[in-house]
Amino acid sequence: MSTFRRLLSHPQLPLITVLLAVGLTLPSLWNGLCFDDFLQRLILLGDNPVSENMPATPWNLFCFHKGNDDYTQKLIHETAFPWWMDGIRFRAYFFRPVSSLSHWVDYLLWPENPLVMHAQSLLWYALLVGLASLLYRRIMGVTWAAGLAALFYAVDDAHGFPAGWLANRNALLACVFGLVCLLAHHRWRQKAWNTGAVVAPLCLALSLLSGEAGLAISGYLLAYAIFLERTSLRARMTSLIPYVIVLFFWALVYMLLGCGIEGMAFYTDPVRETLPYLLKLFERFPVFILGQLAFPPVVYYTLRPAMMQWTGLLFCGLCVLIFLPVLRRDRIARFWATGMGISILPISAVWPHDRNLLFMGLGAMGLIACWFNHTAGIAWNKKTYLWRISMRTLMVLFIIIHGLLAPLTLPATSCILTRFYQKIETAAQALPSGPEYEDTRFITINAPNYLFYVHNIAHLRATQGQYTYLRSLTAGKTPLQVTRLSKNAIKLTAEGGTLIDINRGFHIYQHGTIYPGQVVKQSDVVIEVLEVCDGKPSSAVFHFSKPLDDSQYLWFHWNHDTYASFSFPQIGETVRLEGARFDW
């Protein structure tokens, strides 16, 4: 044990953690592009139909939709948006100019080399881990506990996604600038480094301009003032004024620009949808605690939300018993716990995923290390046998989860996008390509997911010079009955469900108010809703302006893991399609 402690307090440990983190995420260099990367490439390179029809610019890369209702209806009419979004208020506008700048550099210097783009992301991740290691030592001293926290943070498998996905680089930048802010604040308050009064708020601004996740560092600043400062209450609260000013002006600019989220199943805007956000915060708080401190990962919420919620609540109760003794005695532990808890507030606005845990993990690993330090310092021979067995079991579990399983899993999570890309590419290759299909409308009866298997495929093909008109009439895993009513019309009926399955987080496009008899008009089709179940259409008729077998149309359906050609039955006949399922 003494040897292990000496290693954790080694002067070169911060460098070791950086090398370890980079080494474990090195496979991500070959991830290539995936998901939003396709769209960002089209925007940054410009001179293509996709970028010309979007409000985003190279300097404002995350502006997808400014909330203009007429623009939304235009996109629905032109079938760029799915028909079930009719009547919805939609907005998707993130203000992240610093992150946009980092991507602009990629496409300015090495536009055809994704490997170098990923190398830039890994450099940011290396800087993040190094700063975290330095922060632990500044707060906890050059101790084995600080080293343990740094080690656990460096190999946290939750970091694989932001380290390996180019479009998620904004989280790395936000956390890097957030940590510099906290380090500068610490030096200002502890060493009377007055320059820190300028550097720290400036870094907070850079963190916020990198990504909304930067809000989380304000929780650590507040916790610092409450638990770590030893000045008067007035002096501690006064030290926070520069950050309040930065937050105020950032929020003002955010509001004036019209940034925010509306009408997206994946996000909940805390300002525009306050009550739904608070309900989701209550649901997701225990999920984040469970996924960050223990097991399974947060992403399992997508598969088993109820199980994760109830297990998370039970685990939160267990955490009170585990950490209460150290929280009572150690103000540093209280600092980490409070910062961790407050950092959950911004990420609860997003569908739970491990890629959002960079800030939360900072406090979580610090708290675990404080618990180890506190527990190791107790006179064990004076405790009961049950207590000793319980503590040993907990120590072993924490070491297995964060010291063994996490580093073993991190390489896989950092390059998991290659698996996603392969599945999207397989589906994309099932669609014919070539100049003869330039004006062809590719329509699929069903798709497992509209974002991944419609929009992302269209964007992928666009990056390859194939500007594909692709849409799906339904989305989800419900089996369908397809009835041909006439040479121009079909009726789709869901078997025991609805035509759109958007309850899961990966279905990002929310539905508007849908009712029986509703008519939605698109450029070449009129959709008439016949039946509704739970507010979503379960049966609808699609009246196309041209015959279904017109040469302008190519029809497909989802068959196992890819698209397959679809042939309509005779007029008056019905065929059955299995649900469009997909397995990541």
Where are these regions (language model features)?
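Polytopic membrane enzymes that build or remodel cell-surface glycoconjugates and lipids
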Residues: 1-451, 456-460, 525
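C-terminal luminal/periplasmic domains and tails of membrane-associated envelope-modifying transferases
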Residues: 3-4, 428-584
